[in-house]
């Protein structure tokens, strides 16, 4: 695990073949610099988990994010709450239909956080977590979930299984 704060550090991360996952979003800021870092990671061979500010930074041009994800062969996962989902994908329709559409249109496994967290895969699979709690609405809880997803991905779990297992473990 490493914290990345400079271009040199991201270059070191990308050249270190022992690293296989990057998580970006928690604790970042919203804006063009974050977009640039996300796109740089998405052009790498690392599995990438995008959360929080990494998602919100693309709210003005979500297609830029989706195109970068679709162009890669390595996995990408989006862990969003309702607000981030609405900013990227719109907010009309049933929650299950929206998360399935979001996963298909972004070509990423999408986690929609909430008391009934949903996980969707681009092929149309979807699960609803029945293990959730209102306590998950606590600030920082989603950062923990994103970290769990990244940790399980780093152990070579498939994106689908990593997301489902992380959601279940998280509660």
PLM features: what roles do these ranges have?
Residues 134-136:
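Glycine-rich phosphate/pyrophosphate-binding beta-alpha loops
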Residues 1-131:
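Glycine-rich phosphate/dinucleotide-binding loop and adjoining beta-alpha-beta core of small-molecule
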